[in-house]
C-alpha cells in the first residue's frame, strides 16, 4: 500500500493540535438550579396521566376498521404514547396484516406498508406498482397521499426500484406544492422534506408533533392531553438526570484540567435521550452519557491535543485499566484517567450485584476505541491516506464512537440483556457495522471542511477524492449515496428474523436516527449552538396542558 502525498505536514499537525480550541459550554451550571415541581403537583400529573392512559387504551382496544386502526397507531407513535400499548398495537397490526384492504387507496396502502414494515413485517413493495403509469410516474391525486408514499418509501431495502423512484417523484412534487398548502399540512411536508418520518428522532418528533396535532381539526382531546402530560413528566425526569450528570461532570473540572476538549455534557445527554427516551431507560441514559463524555475526552486528546508519544501512553493505560497505570501519564491526563476508573466502580454499584459483570464490556469498548485511534495516529504521522473507502472504514467506523455508545446503552438495560447478548454485540455483528458505517460517513461529510484544516488523518471524503480524483463536492455527494445504502442495509437486517431481542435493533436504529440529526447540516455536537434551541425545546420548555 503506497503512501500518498500528505494532507498536511507533521509540523503543521503538531502546531494546529496545540492551538485548537472549541467554543465553551453553552449551558454551564444551568441544570444545577433545576427545581422539581412540588410533590403534590407531580403526583397530580402522574395520576391524571394514568387515568388518561386507560381511557386511550379503551380507544385502542375498540378500534376495528383498517383506516382508523392505522391512523390511531400512527398518531400514538408520533405523540410518543405507543410504548404504553405495545401488546395492543401488535395485535392490531397482526389483524391489519391478515385482513383485506382497499389496495386502490394510495394513502391507506402507504400507511399500511409503513406501519407493517416499521414493526418488522416483510411486506412487498410491489403494492405500489399499480399506482404508476406507463412512463413510471405515480398517479397521485392529493398531497396527503403523496406525503404518505414519501414516508413509506424510506423503509426501502436494496433492489426496490419502485421505492427509489417513489422518493424521487414525491420529493419533487412535495417541493413544488409546498407554498400552496394550508399551514398544518405545510408544516408536515416541511418536516418530511427535512427528515422522512421513519428517520426522525422519536422524542423530538413527539415534541414537534404535539403542537401540530393540537391544530388538527380531527384531534382527540384525550389523546392530546395525555401526550402533553406524558411528555412533561419525561421532561422532569430528564432534568433530574441532567442535574446529577452536571454535578458529576463538574467534579472532573474540565475547564481547568482539560480546557481544550469539547465541553458538551448537556449535548451528550441530549444525544443519549434521543436514542433511549423512555422512562425505564434512565440508568441507560446516565451510563451512556458518561461513556460519551469519556469517548469525547479520549477523542479530543488523541486526535487533537496530545503528541503521538502522549497518545500512546494513554492508550496503554486504557488497555491496563488499573490505578497504577496513571503513573505512565502526563499530569494533565492523570485526574481524568483516575476519574474514569472511579466511574467504572460507581457504575458497578448502580448496576447491582447481578449485573455488575457488565462493566467489563465498558472497559473492552474503550480498548477497541483507543486501538483504532492509535491506527489513525499512525496514518496521520506517516501521511498515509487509505487507498479505498473500505480500507478506511475498517478502522474509522470503530473510532467514530457509535459502536461504543450503542453497546454501552445495553449495559444499563434490564435482565433481557444477557452476557451472551453482550458477547455477541462485542463481536461487531452486521447490524452494528452498518450503523457505525452510517455514522462515520455522516460525521465525515459534516466535519470534512473543519478537519481539513486541523491536522487530522484523512477522512473518507478525502479518501474518495484521492481514489477517484474528484472535487470535495462530488466526493460528499457520493458519500451521501453510501449513507442511503447503509439505511437500506439496516432496514434489511431489521426485517430479517433473529434470535436477538427486538430492543437491540430498535435501539441501534435510534442511534442512527440521532446521528443523522446531529450531522444533518453540520457537526452539531462540536458546533452545538446550532441545536441549542432544540435542546431547550426538549429539556426546558414544557407543553402547555
UniProtKB/Swiss-Prot annotation:
Gene Ontology cellular-component terms for this entry are: cytoplasm
- Give the primary localization class: cytoplasm
Against Pfam families, the record matches this protein to: Terpene_synth (PF01397), Terpene_synth_C (PF03936)
Single Gene Ontology BP term? defense response
Q: What class of enzyme is it?
A: lyase
InterPro entries (UniProt xref):
Isoprenoid_synthase_dom_sf (IPR008949), Terpene_cyclase-like_1_C (IPR034741), Terpene_cyclase_plant_C1 (IPR044814), Terpene_synth_N (IPR001906), Terpene_synth_N_sf (IPR036965), Terpene_synthase-like (IPR050148), Terpene_synthase_metal-bd (IPR005630), Terpenoid_cyclase/PrenylTrfase (IPR008930)
Instruction: Spell out the molecular function terms from Gene Ontology.
Output: beta-sesquiphellandrene synthase activity; magnesium ion binding; terpene synthase activity
Report keywords, A-Z: Cytoplasm, Lyase, Magnesium, Manganese, Metal-binding, Plant defense
- Residues binding Mg(2+) 1 are 299, 303
What subcellular compartments does it reside in?
Answer: Cytoplasm
Q: At which positions is motif DDXXD motif?
A: 299-303
Where is Mg(2+) 2 annotated to bind?
299, 303
Per its UniProt record, the required cofactor names are: Mg(2+); Mn(2+)
Binding residue positions for Mg(2+) 3: 443, 447, 451
Q: What induces it?
A: Up-regulated by herbivory.
CDD domains from the entry? Terpene_cyclase_plant_C1 (cd00684)
Question: Where does this protein act, in terms of pathway?
Answer: Secondary metabolite biosynthesis; terpenoid biosynthesis
Identify the EC number(s): 4.2.3.123
Q: What does this protein do?
A: Sesquiterpene synthase converting farnesyl diphosphate into beta-sesquiphellandrene and six minor products, zingiberene, 7-epi-sesquithujene, sesquisabinene A, (E)-alpha-bergamotene, (E)-beta-farnesene and beta-bisabolene. Can also accept geranyl diphosphate as substrate, producing nine monoterpenes, with myrcene and limonene as the major products.
Family membership:
Belongs to the terpene synthase family.
Entry protein name: Beta-sesquiphellandrene synthase
Q: Which organism is it from?
A: Sorghum bicolor (Sorghum)
Amino acid at each position: 500500500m503506497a503512501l500518498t502525498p500528505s494532507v498536511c505536514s507533521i509540523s503543521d499537525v503538531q502546531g494546529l493540535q496545540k492551538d485548537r480550541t472549541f467554543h465553551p459550554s453553552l449551558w454551564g451550571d444551568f441544570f444545577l438550579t433545576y427545581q422539581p415541581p412540588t410533590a403534590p403537583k407531580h403526583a397530580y400529573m402522574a395520576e391524571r396521566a394514568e387515568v388518561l392512559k386507560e381511557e386511550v387504551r379503551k380507544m385502542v382496544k375498540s378500534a376495528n376498521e383498517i383506516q382508523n386502526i392505522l391512523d390511531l397507531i400512527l398518531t400514538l407513535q408520533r405523540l410518543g404514547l405507543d410504548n404504553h400499548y405495545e401488546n395492543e398495537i401488535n395485535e392490531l397490526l397482526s389483524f391489519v396484516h391478515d385482513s383485506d384492504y382497499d389496495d386502490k387507496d394510495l394513502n391507506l396502502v402507504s400507511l399500511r406498508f409503513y406501519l407493517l414494515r416499521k414493526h418488522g413485517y416483510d411486506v412487498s413493495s410491489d403494492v405500489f406498482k399499480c399506482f404508476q403509469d406507463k412512463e413510471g410516474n405515480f398517479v397521485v391525486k392529493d398531497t396527503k397521499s403523496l406525503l404518505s408514499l414519501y414516508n413509506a418509501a424510506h423503509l426501502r431495502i436494496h433492489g426496490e426500484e419502485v421505492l427509489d423512484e417513489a422518493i424521487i417523484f414525491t420529493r419533487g412534487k412535495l417541493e413544488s406544492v409546498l407554498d400552496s398548502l394550508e399551514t398544518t399540512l405545510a408544516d408536515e411536508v416541511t418536516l418530511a422534506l427535512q427528515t422522512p418520518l421513519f428517520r426522525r428522532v422519536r422524542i423530538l418528533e413527539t415534541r414537534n408533533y404535539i403542537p401540530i396535532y393540537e391544530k388538527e381539526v380531527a384531534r382527540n382531546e384525550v389523546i392530546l392531553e395525555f401526550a402533553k402530560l406524558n411528555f412533561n413528566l419525561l421532561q422532569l425526569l430528564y432534568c433530574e438526570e441532567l442535574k446529577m450528570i452536571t454535578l458529576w461532570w463538574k467534579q472532573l473540572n474540565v475547564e481547568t484540567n482539560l480546557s481544550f476538549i469539547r465541553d458538551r455534557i448537556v449535548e451528550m445527554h441530549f444525544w443519549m435521550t434521543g436514542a433511549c427516551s423512555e422512562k425505564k431507560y434512565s440508568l441507560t441514559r446516565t451510563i451512556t452519557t458518561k461513556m460519551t463524555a469519556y469517548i469525547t475526552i479520549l477523542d479530543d486528546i488523541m486526535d487533537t491535543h496530545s503528541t503521538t508519544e502522549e497518545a500512546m501512553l494513554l492508550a496503554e493505560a486504557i488497555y491496563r485499566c488499573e490505578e497504577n497505570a496513571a503513573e505512565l501519564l502526563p499530569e494533565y491526563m492523570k485526574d481524568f484517567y483516575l476519574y474514569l476508573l472511579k466511574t467504572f466502580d460507581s457504575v458497578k454499584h448502580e448496576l447491582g450485584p447481578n449485573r455488575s459483570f457488565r462493566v467489563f464490556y465498558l472497559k473492552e469498548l474503550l480498548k477497541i476505541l483507543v486501538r483504532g485511534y492509535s491506527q489513525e495516529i499512525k496514518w496521520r504521522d506517516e501521511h498515509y491516506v487509505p487507498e479505498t473507502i473500505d480500507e478506511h472504514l475498517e478502522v474509522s467506523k470503530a473510532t467514530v464512537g457509535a459502536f461504543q455508545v450503542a453497546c454501552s446503552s445495553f449495559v444499563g438495560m434490564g435482565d433481557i440483556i444477557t452476557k451472551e447478548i453482550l458477547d455477541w454485540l462485542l463481536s461487531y455483528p452486521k447490524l452494528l457495522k452498518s450503523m457505525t458505517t452510517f455514522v462515520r460517513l455522516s460525521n465525515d461529510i459534516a466535519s470534512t471542511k473543519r478537519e481539513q484544516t486541523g491536522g487530522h488523518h484523512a477522512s473518507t471524503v478525502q479518501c474518495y477524492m484521492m481514489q477517484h480524483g474528484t472535487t470535495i463536492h462530488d466526493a460528499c455527494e457520493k458519500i451521501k449515496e453510501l449513507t442511503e445504502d447503509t439505511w437500506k442495509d439496516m432496514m434489511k437486517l431489521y426485517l430479517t428474523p433473529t434470535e436477538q431481542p427486538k430492543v437491540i435493533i430498535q435501539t441501534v436504529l435510534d442511534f442512527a436516527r440521532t446521528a443523522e440529526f446531529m450531522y444533518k447540516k453540520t457537526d452539531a455536537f462540536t458546533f452545538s449552538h446550532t441545536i441549542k434551541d432544540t435542546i431547550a425545546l426538549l429539556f426546558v420548555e414544557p407543553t402547555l396542558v
